C-alpha cells in the first residue's frame, strides 16, 4: 500500500472580456509554488499566502517567461498520473473553480495542437506508450465511459439507448458504480477522440434542448486500462487494471454574482450542493489526516458525507481511498471575483492535506469472479431458504450466466407456447415473491451480481462488437436528428463543407459551440419537433420549439448560385440577426439564427461567401467573433433592450423600494415603541397607586435647619470621607468589564504555546505591599496625600511559567499588549510551525507576552520599631519576613541600640561587613504640615516620585491602635462609628511629654547616633538562593543599606549577615515622632531557582485561604429560578435597612404511600454538614414538596400568600450555568398555605409562651413534567441529581414578593427498592426519643432583610445601581482550550480583604511584640516603665475592652456625646446586670411597662435558681436528657424598641396543624394593637439570602440549658460554626433544631455571681430578645466554650487569671 497526499495545483487565467470591460485589477501573485491573494477591499491587510505543489501563472501571454502552457501542465501532472496508471494504481484528475475560471480549458482544451488539455494529451500519450511497447508478453486493452451529472442525475453520453437517468448503486465488492453505464472498447487514440467528440455532441444536444450549459453539469470521463502479462515459463497470465477518472467539475458560483433566478437558481443550488458536499468531504478527510487526529482511533463522529451527493459518492475511492489523485484549481485573477477565488484557494488548501492509500490492482478479475460466485451461491441459498429455489432452477441457461428474466417479464425463448406455458408459473412466482419477506431484495441483488459477472466474462472481441453496435446506433440517432454525416456514415467532427449550405450550433460553452452541423439540402428542409405529424429533417426539442417550427428553402438561381430562404411557421419564435422573422427572409452567410429561446445557429454558405470575397477582397470582418454571446447581445439590441439601462433602472427601483420599506418599518417601530411606553407608564402608575399611597404635598411642613454639634459634624465628615473613597463596586465593575480581555489573552497564550498565564489581582498600597509608580493611575499622584485610606487597584498578574517570573500589568497595559497578541496570532497562521517553535525558545523584547525580569526576587518585608531609642535601651528583635500575600517566609534577627559617636562595633568574627556612619536628615516642615492635616495618610509606601523622596510620614503619630482596620484599608465595609482619636493612640499618648525634660539624650538640635545590626536570617526556603537584605527609613527609600549576598541551602545554621550600620541623625521633632511610632523597613531578596506555577486551572484547584468572615462554599448558591406566572416588575432599589430576621426553613419531599398518605421521603445526612442532605426518592411515585418557615414573631413580618413555587435547573453537578435559559422550569400547583401550630412533639423544643410563627405551604410536584432524563430514570451509581427550588411569597407592606431559593440534592431508586439509608437512619434514632420521620428533612438558614425604598434621586444611589455587564460569560475564540479556567470575580475582593487583614494583624503583632519586649527590657534594667507599658495599664485597658459598652469619662468627668447610652443600651445593660446578680423580684411580671419580656424571662430563671441554690448541676436527676428543651430564644422586644430583632435559633416543625388564614389586620404575635396603629406603615423591599454554613467547627459538645419555670437543666448538643451556634437534641441528631446568631449576641461571665448562687461553670448569652443561661461540665470546658462563643472575652478572662496566679505566686 502506498500512502500519498493529493497533488494540488492552481492555475490563473487571463482576463476575459467581462473583466476587461470593468477595468479589473489582478489580485493573484505567484512565486514558485506559493500563491498570494490580495483583498481589494482592504489593501492594507496582509495578503493571504497559500503553498501548493504547483502554481501555474497563465495570466499573461505565452511570450512571458513565467507563462505556464498546456504542455507544462500536462508534463507536471498528466505524465505523473499516467505513470501511476501503468504501475497499476487508480488515477483521478479533477478540475475545480468558479464558472469561467478555465477548468474546461485545462481539462479539455481546444482542437488546436498546442491548445489541447490534459484529457486529450493523456489519451494520446497513453496509446503512444502502448504502441512503443516491444515486449511480446505484454498486451493492453482500453475501455472508455463518458457520463454527465446534472442536478444529481446521471446521463450516459456514449449510448443513445440510455436516454433516461441511470441509477447509482453500491456493490459490497465493487463499491459505488453506475448501473448500465456503457463501457466501450477502443484500440487507438482516434477512437477515443471520436468518442469524446460524440459524447460532446450528445452533451450539446441534450444541453441545448434543456437550455443548459456545461458550467452547470459535471462531466466524468473514465478509462479502464488493463495490462496483461503472460509468463511463458509458468504459463500464467497476470493482470493489472487501472481506472483513470478525468473529472470536469461544474462551476462554483454564487447566486448573487450570477443573477440566477427560477430554474437557473435551482440548478445552481444542485451544483452548489454537490460542490458543498465535496467541500465537506475534503474538510473531513483533511481533519482526519491532520497531525493531532492522525494517530487517534477513528470515532463515530469521524463521518465522511460521501452519500450526500452523487458526485462524491462516485468519487469516493478517488478522495481518500484507493487512488492517486490530483486536483487543478482554476482561478480568476480579477478583483471582482475575490470571494470566489479565495474560496477556491481554501478548498485547494484543505485538499492537499488528504492522504490516499492507493494499492496496485493486480489480478482483480480472478479474485472478483470468485467472490461474486460465492455471493451468487449465498444468495441462491437464501432463496432456497425462502422456498424459492425453483426460480433459479427454471431460469438457468446451460453453459452461461444465470439470468432472472422471468422476474422482469421477459422470456429467453421466442416461442409463444413457451411464453404461455410459463405464464402461470410467473404469476405464481410473483405471488410467492410478494409474500416472501426479503426475497425481492435478494433477487434484485442476484440480478445485479449476475449482470456484473456477465460483463466481466465478456471477451475482448465481444466488447469490440458491442462498441461498434453502440456507435452505429448513436450515429443513426444523430442522423435522424439531421446532424451531418460523413461518407462512411460517421458524424462530422471539426469539419466545414466546401459547397453545401449548412447550420452550425453556437453555445455559451466554447466546447459545445460549432459541435453540431446540419445540412440544408436542395429544396425544402423542415425544422421541428420529433412528435410532429410530418417527418422533420432537423429535429429539435426543448422549450418554445413548435411541432413545425420553420422551413429552409434552397433554390438555384442563374449562375448556379443557391439561395436559401427562411420561412417561419405560424406562432414560432424565429430570429435572424436579432430581428424576429414573420415572413420569408433570404439568408446570407454568417447570419445568426435563433429558434425558440435556446437554439442558436450560424448560417454558413461556402459558395456565397467565396463569391463575396472575390467581389470585395477587403470585406469588413466583425470586430468581435460571431459566437453565442454576440448573438444574444444582438438579439437584445434589436429588440430595444439596453441591458445596462435595464440594470440601472432595476437597481433604482430596488433602492426606492428599500427606502420606502425602511421608512415604513422605522415608522411602525416608532409607533410600537410609543405604544409600549404608554402601556408601561400606565402599568407603572397602576403599581405605584397600589403600593405608594398618595401624599398631599400641601400638608408637608418645611423642615427647620438642623443645628449640628461639633461631634455630629465630625461624624458627618468622617462618613463623607468614608464613602467618598469607597471602592467595592468600582473594583467589581473593573473585574466584570475586563474579564473578556483576560480570557482572550489566556486563550491566545495557550494556542501559541507561550506558557504565560494571566489572572486578575488586587494590589493595595500598604507597608508590606507598596505599589510601584507604573501601576498607579495618573490621577493617583494628585490625591495620594489627601486619601484617608490606601488605594486599591485592579491589576493583572502575569505568570511567566517559562522563566519563573511574575509581573504585574495595569488594565491599560493589558489592552495594549492584547492588540499586539492579536497581531501575533494572525501572523502565526502564516508562519510554519517549526519557525514558531524556534521562536518560542528565545524570549525577545518584541514579544508582547514577556517582560524583562530581575535576577533577584523579593522574598518579603519586615519592620523593626525604634521606640527603645527613647529611653534608651538596646533590643534584639526577631521579626517575621512577610510576603506581599501575607505569608511568613522566614525570620530576621536585628539589633537596635543607641551608641556614642566614637563607639566601635563588637567583634562578630570573620566575614563581618563594617560600614561607616551614615547621616540621615528629618525635616520639621513636613511634620508641621502633617500635624495640620485632618486626615493623615496611613501606611505610606516608599514608591513615590522624585519630588516626594523627602516625604515625612512619621509625623502623623500613629500607633498600634491608630491604623485603620483591614476593612477600612480595602474600603469594603463601613464600621458603625468612626474611630475616635484617630491621630492618637495609648502608646503615643504615654510617650508624649516634655521633650526637653523626659528625653535628655534627644535634645533638639543635637546629634544622636544609633546602630542597626542585621544578625541572622532563618527559616528561608531553599528555593531562594543568594539571600541578601537591605533596609531603609520609610521616607528615605532612596537611601538603602544593603548586606552582601549569602548562599542559602535551607539546611544548617541560620544565615549570618552580621552587618553593622551606624546612623547619625540631627534630633528634630519629626525624628522623635518617627521613632515613637514608625519602623525601619527591611527587605529580603533572593534568586528564585524554581518555577512554582501550576497549570492554568490553579485558581480552581488551590484558592486562597478565605477570611474567617467569608468561608469557602460547600455547594454553590444558586440564583432564584425565574417565575413563570408573575409579571416582570422593576425591582425597587433597596435603601437603608429597616430590620433583619433569621429564618429557619424546613424542606420536605413527601411520597405517596400505599395507605394514601404522603410520607416524607428518606434523607441521607451522611455528608456531615448542616443544612445539607440527599433526598432518596423512588421512581414513578407521586410527590409533594412541603416548605415550613419558622421565625420569631414580629410586627414587620407578615406572610400573605405564596404567589408561585417554581423548580428547575435539573443537572447532575452542583454547579449550574445560570446564563442559559432553562426550558424545563415548572411552576407547581400550590395545594395549601397558611400559618400553622406546631405539633405537640415540636412544642417540647420550645417555650410555649414565646411568640413564634410557623408558616407552611405545600405543592404537588410531578417530576415527569420536566421531561428530563435525569428525573425519569434510576440514578446511576455515585451520581446525584441537583435541582433548584424558588418560592415567591408575598408579604404585607412590601413592594414585591420575597424569594426563598434552595438547591435540592436527590438520588432516584427503583419503585420497589428498599433504601439502604433508611436503615442507618433508623439506627441513628434508635434511642427511641425521636421519631423516624423527624430526620427526613433538609434545613436552611436564611437572613431576611427589610429595607426602605431608596431615593431615586440620590447620585450615589444611581451610581451604585448602575449595571455593568459581566463579560466573563461571553465566549472568546479558543476558550475551550482553557480547561475550565475562569477569571476571578467578586470572590477576589473578599479574598484580598482577608489578605489585608492578615497583613494588618501581622503588623499589629510585630508592634505589640516590640512593646512587650521593650517593657520587659525596662523592667530588667530597673528603669521606670511608662504608664502605657505597665501591667496595670494593660489590665485596665483589657478591662475596658472586655466591658465593651462601658463609657469612659472625658477630662471633665462627663461622658462624651457618643458615649452616652441610649434607651435600648440602658435596658440591655440592666438585663445583663440582673442576670448576673440573680436578684430579681419574684413577683416581677409582664405588667411592668418599663421592663421588656426578655427581662421577665431572665427574672424567672433567676428565681428558679434562688429557690434551690444547693442543687448540683451535674448530679441531680433533673439533668438527665429529657424531652424538654430550654428556651434558647425567648421574649419579644418591648414597646420602646424601635429596632427589629435578629432571631438566632429555630425549632423544628414536623407535622404541623394548619390554622385558618390570618386576617391582614391581625398579627400572629401578641403585639399591642395600639402600638401597631401608631406606627406608620411604610413600604419595604424584602431580600432573603441563604446563609452558607461554615465548614470550620470551633467547638462542639454538650451544654446544659436552664429550663424556664423549673429548676432543672436540659442537656443539648451544640456545634459552633461561627457566626452561628447550631443546637441539636443529641450528637446523633441530624436536623438543626434552632440556631443562635453569635454576631448579634453578647456573652457575659461573672465569677462572683457563680459563687453566690452556687452554680459553677455557668455563663450567659444575651440576644436582642432574651437571655440564656448555660452550664458546662468543667471549668476548662467552660473556658473552651467561652472561647468558641467570644474569643476576645475568653482571652481577657484568661489574661486576668494568669496575672492573678502570678501575683499569688509572688505573694
UniProtKB/Swiss-Prot annotation:
Q: Which GO terms describe its molecular function?
A: ATP binding; ATP hydrolysis activity; identical protein binding; microtubule binding; plus-end-directed microtubule motor activity
Binding residue positions for Mg(2+): 104
Q: Where is the composition biased (Low complexity)?
A: 1429-1453
Domain spans labelled FHA: 525-581
Task: Give residue ranges for domain Kinesin motor.
Answer: 5-354
The record's listing under Pfam families reads: DUF3694, FHA, KIF1B, Kinesin, Kinesin_assoc, PH
Provide the residue span(s) of the region labelled Disordered: 1424-1462, 1536-1576
What EC number(s) are associated with this protein in UniProt? 5.6.1.3
Binding of ATP, residues: 102-105, 215
Question: What membrane topology does the UniProt entry give?
Answer: Peripheral membrane protein
Among SUPFAM superfamilies, the record links this protein to: P-loop containing nucleoside triphosphate hydrolases (SSF52540), PH domain-like (SSF50729), SMAD/FHA domain (SSF49879)
Q: Does the keyword Isomerase apply?
A: yes
Annotated region (Required for interaction with CALM1, PPFIA2 and TANC2), positions in chain: 657-1105
- Give the UniProt keywords, A-Z: ATP-binding, Cell projection, Coiled coil, Cytoplasm, Cytoplasmic vesicle, Cytoskeleton, Hydrolase, Isomerase, Magnesium, Membrane, Metal-binding, Microtubule, Motor protein, Nucleotide-binding, Phosphoprotein, Synapse
Q: State the reactions this protein catalyses.
A: ATP + H2O + a kinesin associated with a microtubule at position (n) = ADP + phosphate a kinesin associated with a microtubule at position (n+1, toward the plus end)
Which CDD domains does the annotation name?
A: FHA_KIF1A, KISc_KIF1A_KIF1B, PH_KIFIA_KIFIB
Source domain of life: Eukaryota
> Where does this polypeptide localize?
Cytoplasm, Cytoskeleton; Cell projection, Neuron projection; Cell projection, Axon; Cytoplasm, Perinuclear region
Task: Please give the record's comment on domains.
Answer: Composed of an N-terminal active core containing the motor domain (MD) and a neck coil (NC), a central regulatory center required for dimerization and activation and containing the FHA domain and coiled coils (CC1 and CC2), and a cargo-recognition region containing a coiled coil (CC3), an undefined region (UDR) and the C-terminal PH domain.
What family does this chain come from, according to its entry?
A: Belongs to the TRAFAC class myosin-kinesin ATPase superfamily. Kinesin family. Unc-104 subfamily.
Q: What is the documented function of this protein?
A: Kinesin motor with a plus-end-directed microtubule motor activity, involved in anterograde axonal transport of synaptic vesicle precursors. Also required for neuronal dense core vesicles (DCVs) transport to the dendritic spines and axons. The interaction calcium-dependent with CALM1 increases vesicle motility and interaction with the scaffolding proteins PPFIA2 and TANC2 recruits DCVs to synaptic sites.
Name of the molecule in the record: Kinesin-like protein KIF1A
Taxonomic lineage of the native organism: Eukaryota, Metazoa, Chordata, Craniata, Vertebrata
Amino acid at each position: 500500500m502506498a500512502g500519498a497526499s493529493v497533488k494540488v495545483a492552481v492555475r490563473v487565467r487571463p482576463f476575459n472580456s467581462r473583466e476587461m470591460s470593468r477595468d479589473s485589477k489582478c489580485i493573484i501573485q505567484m512565486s514558485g509554488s506559493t500563491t498570494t491573494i490580495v483583498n481589494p477591499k482592504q489593501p492594507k491587510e496582509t495578503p493571504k499566502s497559500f503553498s501548493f505543489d504547483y502554481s501555474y501563472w497563465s495570466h499573461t501571454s505565452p511570450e512571458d517567461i513565467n507563462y505556464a502552457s498546456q504542455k507544462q501542465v500536462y508534463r507536471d501532472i498528466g505524465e505523473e498520473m499516467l505513470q501511476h496508471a501503468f504501475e497499476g494504481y487508480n488515477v483521478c484528475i479533477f478540475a475545480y473553480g468558479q464558472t469561467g475560471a478555465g477548468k474546461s480549458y485545462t481539462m479539455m482544451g481546444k482542437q488546436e495542437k498546442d491548445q489541447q488539455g490534459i484529457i486529450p494529451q493523456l489519451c494520446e500519450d497513453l496509446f503512444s506508450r502502448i504502441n512503443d511497447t516491444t515486449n511480446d508478453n505484454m498486451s493492453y486493452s482500453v475501455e472508455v465511459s463518458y457520463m454527465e451529472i446534472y442536478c444529481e442525475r446521471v446521463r450516459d453520453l456514449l449510448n443513445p439507448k440510455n436516454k433516461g437517468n441511470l441509477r447509482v448503486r453500491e456493490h459490497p465488492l465493487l463499491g459505488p458504480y453506475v448501473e448500465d453505464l456503457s463501457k466501450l472498447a477502443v484500440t487507438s487514440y482516434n477512437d477515443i477522440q471520436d468518442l469524446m467528440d460524440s459524447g460532446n455532441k450528445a452533451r450539446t444536444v441534450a444541453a441545448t434542448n434543456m437550455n443548459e450549459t456545461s458550467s452547470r453539469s459535471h462531466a466524468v470521463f473514465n478509462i479502464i486500462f488493463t495490462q496483461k502479462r503472460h509468463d511463458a515459463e509458468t504459463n500464467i497470465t497476470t493482470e493489472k487494471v487501472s481506472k483513470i477518472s478525468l473529472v470536469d467539475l461544474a462551476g462554483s458560483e454564487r447566486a448573487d454574482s450570477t443573477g440566477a433566478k427560477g430554474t437557473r437558481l435551482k440548478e445552481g443550488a444542485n451544483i452548489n450542493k454537490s460542490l458543498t458536499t465535496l467541500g465537506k468531504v475534503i474538510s473531513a478527510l483533511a481533519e482526519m489526516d491532520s497531525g493531532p487526529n492522525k494517530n487517534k482511533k477513528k470515532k463515530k463522529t469521524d463521518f465522511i458525507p460521501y452519500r450526500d451527493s452523487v458526485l462524491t459518492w462516485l468519487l469516493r475511492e478517488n478522495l481518500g481511498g484507493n487512488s492517486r489523485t490530483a486536483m487543478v484549481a482554476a482561478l480568476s485573477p480579477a478583483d471582482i471575483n475575490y470571494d470566489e477565488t479565495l474560496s477556491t484557494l481554501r478548498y485547494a488548501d484543505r485538499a492537499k492535506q488528504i492522504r490516499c492509500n492507493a494499492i496496485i490492482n493486480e489480478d482483480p478479475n480472478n479474485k472478483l469472479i470468485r467472490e461474486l460466485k460465492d455471493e451468487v451461491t449465498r444468495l441462491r441459498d437464501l432463496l432456497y431458504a425462502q422456498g424459492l429455489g425453483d426460480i433459479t432452477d427454471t431460469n438457468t441457461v446451460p453453459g452461461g450466466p444465470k439470468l432472472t428474466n422471468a422476474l422482469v417479464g421477459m422470456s429467453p425463448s421466442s416461442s409463444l407456447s413457451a411464453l404461455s406455458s410459463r405464464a402461470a408459473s410467473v404469476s405464481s412466482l410473483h405471488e410467492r415473491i410478494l409474500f416472501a419477506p426479503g426475497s425481492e431484495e435478494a433477487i434484485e441483488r442476484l440480478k445485479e451480481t449476475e449482470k456484473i459477472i456477465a460483463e466481466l466474462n465478456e471477451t475482448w472481441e465481444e466488447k469490440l462488437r458491442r462498441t461498434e453496435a453502440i456507435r452505429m446506433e448513436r450515429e443513426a440517432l444523430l442522423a435522424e436528428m439531421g446532424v451531418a454525416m460523413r461518407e462512411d456514415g460517421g458524424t462530422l467532427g471539426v469539419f466545414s463543407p466546401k459547397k453545401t449550405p449548412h447550420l452550425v450550433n453556437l453555445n455559451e460553452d466554447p466546447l459545445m459551440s460549432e459541435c453540431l452541423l446540419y445540412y440544408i439540402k436542395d429544396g425544402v428542409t423542415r425544422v421541428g419537433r420529433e412528435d410532429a405529424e410530418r417527418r422533420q429533417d432537423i429535429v429539435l426539442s426543448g422549450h418554445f420549439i413548435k411541432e413545425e417550427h420553420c422551413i429552409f428553402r434552397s433554390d438555384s438561381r442563374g449562375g448556379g448560385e443557391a439561395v436559401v430562404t427562411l420561412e417561419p411557421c405560424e406562432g414560432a419564435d424565429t430570429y435572424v440577426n436579432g430581428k424576429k422573422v414573420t415572413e420569408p427572409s433570404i439568408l446570407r452567410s454568417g447570419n445568426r439564427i435563433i429558434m425558440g429561446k435556446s437554439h442558436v445557429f450560424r448560417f454558413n454558405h461556402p459558395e456565397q461567401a467565396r463569391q463575396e470575397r472575390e467581389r470585395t477582397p477587403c470585406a469588413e470582418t466583425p470586430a468581435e467573433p460571431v459566437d453565442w454571446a454576440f448573438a444574444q447581445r444582438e438579439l437584445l439590441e434589436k429588440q430595444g433592450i439596453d441591458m445596462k439601462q435595464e440594470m440601472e433602472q432595476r437597481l433604482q427601483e430596488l433602492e426606492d423600494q428599500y427606502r420606502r420599506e425602511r421608512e415604513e418599518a422605522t415608522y411602525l417601530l416608532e409607533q410600537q415603541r410609543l405604544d409600549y411606553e404608554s402601556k408601561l407608564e400606565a402599568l407603572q402608575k397602576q403599581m405605584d397607586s397600589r403600593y405608594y399611597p398618595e401624599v398631599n404635598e400641601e400638608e408637608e411642613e418645611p423642615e427647620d435647619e438642623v443645628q449640628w454639634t461639633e461631634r455630629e459634624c465630625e461624624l458627618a465628615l468622617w462618613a463623607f470621607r468614608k464613602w467618598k473613597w469607597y471602592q467595592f463596586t468600582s473594583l467589581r465593575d473593573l473585574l466584570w468589564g475586563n474579564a473578556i480581555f483576560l480570557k482572550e489573552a489566556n486563550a491566545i497564550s495557550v494556542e501559541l504555546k507561550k506558557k504565560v498565564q494571566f489572572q486578575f489581582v488586587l494590589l493595595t498600597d500598604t507597608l508590606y505591599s507598596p505599589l510601584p509608580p507604573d501601576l498607579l493611575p495618573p490621577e493617583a499622584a494628585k490625591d495620594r496625600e489627601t486619601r484617608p485610606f490606601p488605594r486599591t487597584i485592579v491589576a493583572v498578574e502575569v505568570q511567566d511559567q517559562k522563566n519563573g517570573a511574575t509581573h504585574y500589568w495595569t488594565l491599560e497595559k493589558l489592552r495594549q499588549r492584547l492588540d499586539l497578541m492579536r497581531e501575533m496570532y494572525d501572523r502565526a497562521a502564516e508562519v510554519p510551525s517549526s519557525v514558531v517553535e524556534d521562536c518560542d525558545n528565545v524570549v525577545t523584547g518584541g514579544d508582547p507576552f514577556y517582560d524583562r525580569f530581575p535576577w533577584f526576587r523579593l522574598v518579603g518585608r519586615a519592620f523593626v520599631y525604634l521606640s527603645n531609642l527613647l529611653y534608651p535601651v538596646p533590643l534584639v528583635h526577631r521579626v517575621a519576613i512577610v510576603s506581599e500575600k501575607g505569608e511568613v517566609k522566614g525570620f530576621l534577627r536585628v539589633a537596635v541600640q543607641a551608641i556614642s559617636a566614637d563607639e566601635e562595633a563588637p567583634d562578630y568574627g570573620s566575614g563581618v561587613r563594617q560600614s561607616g556612619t551614615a547621616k540621615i536628615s528629618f525635616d520639621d516642615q513636613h511634620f508641621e504640615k502633617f500635624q495640620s492635616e485632618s486626615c493623615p495618610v496611613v501606611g505610606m509606601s516608599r514608591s513615590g516620585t522624585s519630588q516626594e523622596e523627602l516625604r515625612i510620614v512619621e509625623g502623623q503619630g500613629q500607633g498600634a491602635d491608630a491604623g485603620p482596620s483591614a476593612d477600612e484599608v480595602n474600603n469594603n465595609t463601613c464600621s458603625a462609628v468612626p474611630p475616635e482619636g484617630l491621630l492618637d493612640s495609648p502608646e503615643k499618648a504615654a510617650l508624649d511629654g516634655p521633650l526637653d525634660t523626659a528625653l535628655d539624650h534627644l535634645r533638639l538640635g543635637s546629634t544622636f547616633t544609633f546602630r542597626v545590626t542585621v544578625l541572622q536570617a532563618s527559616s528561608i526556603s531553599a528555593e531562594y538562593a543568594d539571600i541578601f537584605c537591605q533596609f531603609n527609613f520609610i521616607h528615605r527609600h532612596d537611601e538603602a543599606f544593603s548586606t552582601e549576598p549569602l548562599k542559602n541551602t535551607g539546611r544548617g545554621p541560620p544565615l549570618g549577615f552580621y552587618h553593622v550600620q551606624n546612623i547619625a541623625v540631627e534630633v528634630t521633632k519629626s525624628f522623635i515622632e518617627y521613632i515613637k511610632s514608625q519602623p525601619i523597613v527591611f527587605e529580603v531578596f533572593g534568586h528564585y531557582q524554581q518555577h512554582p506555577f501550576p497549570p492554568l486551572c490553579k485558581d480552581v484547584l488551590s484558592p486562597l485561604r478565605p477570611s474567617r468572615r467569608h468561608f469557602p462554599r460547600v455547594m454553590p448558591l444558586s440564583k432564584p429560578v425565574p417565575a413563570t406566572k408573575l409579571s416582570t416588575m422593576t425591582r425597587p432599589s433597596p435603601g437603608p435597612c429597616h430590620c433583619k430576621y433569621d429564618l429557619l426553613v424546613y424542606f420536605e419531599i413527601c411520597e405517596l404511600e400505599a395507605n394514601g398518605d404522603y410520607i416524607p421521603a428518606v434523607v441521607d445526612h451522611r455528608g456531615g454538614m448542616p443544612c445539607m442532605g440527599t433526598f432518596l426518592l423512588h421512581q414513578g411515585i407521586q410527590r409533594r414538596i412541603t416548605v415550613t418557615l419558622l421565625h420569631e414573631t414580629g410586627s414587620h413580618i407578615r406572610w400573605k400568600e405564596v404567589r408561585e413555587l417554581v423548580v428547575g435547573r435539573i443537572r447532575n453537578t452542583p454547579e449550574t450555568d445560570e446564563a442559559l435559559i432553562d426550558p424545563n422550569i415548572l411552576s407547581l400547583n400550590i395545594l395549601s398555605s397558611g400559618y400553622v401550630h406546631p405539633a405537640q412533639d415540636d412544642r417540647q423544643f420550645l417555650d410555649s409562651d414565646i411568640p413564634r410563627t410557623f408558616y407552611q405551604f405545600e405543592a404537588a410536584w410531578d417530576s415527569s413534567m420536566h421531561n428530563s432524563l435525569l428525573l425519569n430514570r434510576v440514578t446511576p451509581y455515585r451520581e446525584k441529581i441537583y435541582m433548584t427550588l424558588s418560592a415567591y411569597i408575598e408579604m404585607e407592606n412590601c413592594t414585591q414578593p420575597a424569594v426563598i431559593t434552595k438547591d435540592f440534592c436527590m438520588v432516584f431508586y427503583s419503585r420497589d427498592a428498599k433504601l439502604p439509608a433508611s436503615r442507618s437512619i433508623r439506627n441513628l434514632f434508635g434511642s427511641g426519643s425521636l421519631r423516624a420521620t423527624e430526620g427526613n428533612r433538609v434545613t436552611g438558614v436564611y437572613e431576611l432583610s427589610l429595607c426602605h425604598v431608596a431615593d431615586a434621586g440620590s447620585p450615589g444611589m444611581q451610581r451604585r445601581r448602575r449595571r455593568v455587564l459581566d463579560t466573563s460569560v461571553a465566549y472568546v475564540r479558543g476558550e475551550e482550550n482553557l480547561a475550565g479556567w475562569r477569571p476571578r470575580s467578586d470572590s477576589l475582593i473578599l479574598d484580598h480583604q482577608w489578605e489585608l487583614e492578615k497583613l494588618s494583624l501581622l503588623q499589629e503583632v510585630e508592634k505589640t511584640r516590640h512593646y512587650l519586649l521593650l517593657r520587659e527590657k525596662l523592667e530588667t534594667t530597673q528603669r521606670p516603665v511608662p504608664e502605657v507599658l505597665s501591667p496595670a495599664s494593660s489590665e485596665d485597658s483589657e478591662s475596658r475592652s472586655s466591658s465593651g459598652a462601658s463609657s469612659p469619662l472625658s477630662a471633665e468627668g462627663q461622658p462624651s456625646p457618643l458615649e452616652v447610652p441610649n434607651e435600648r443600651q440602658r435596658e440591655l445593660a440592666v438585663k445583663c446586670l440582673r442576670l448576673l446578680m440573680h436578684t430579681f423580684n419574684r413577683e416581677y411580671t409582664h405588667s411592668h411597662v418599663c421592663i421588656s419580656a426578655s427581662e421577665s424571662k431572665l427574672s424567672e430563671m433567676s428565681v428558679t435558681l434562688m429557690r434551690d441554690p444547693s442543687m448540683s448541676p451535674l448530679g441531680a436527676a433533673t439533668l438527665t436528657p429529657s424531652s424538654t428543651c430550654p428556651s434558647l430564644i425567648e421574649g419579644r422586644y418591648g414597646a420602646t424598641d424601635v429596632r427589629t430583632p435578629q432571631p438566632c435559633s429555630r425549632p423544628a416543625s414536623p407535622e404541623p396543624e394548619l390554622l385558618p388564614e390570618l386576617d391582614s389586620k391581625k398579627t400572629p404575635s401578641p403585639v399591642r394593637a395600639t402600638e401597631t396603629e401608631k406606627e406608620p406603615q411604610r413600604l419595604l423591599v424584602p431580600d432573603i439570602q441563604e446563609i452558607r454554613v461554615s465548614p470550620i467547627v470551633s467547638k462542639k459538645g454538650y451544654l446544659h440549658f436552664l429550663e424556664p419555670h423549673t429548676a432543672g437543666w436540659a442537656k443539648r448538643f451544640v456545634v459552633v460554626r461561627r457566626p452561628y451556634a447550631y443546637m441539636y437534641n443529641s450528637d446523633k441528631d441530624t436536623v438543626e433544631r434552632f440556631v443562635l446568631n453569635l454576631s448579634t449576641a453578647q456573652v457575659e461571665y461573672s465569677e462572683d455571681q457563680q459563687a453566690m448562687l452556687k452554680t459553677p461553670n455557668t455563663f450567659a448569652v444575651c440576644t436582642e430578645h432574651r437571655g440564656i443561661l448555660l452550664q458546662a461540665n468543667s471549668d476548662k470546658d467552660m473556658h473552651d466554650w467561652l472561647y468558641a462563643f467570644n474569643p476576645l472575652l475568653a482571652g481577657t478572662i484568661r489574661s486576668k487569671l494568669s496575672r492573678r496566679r502570678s501575683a499569688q505566686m509572688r505573694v
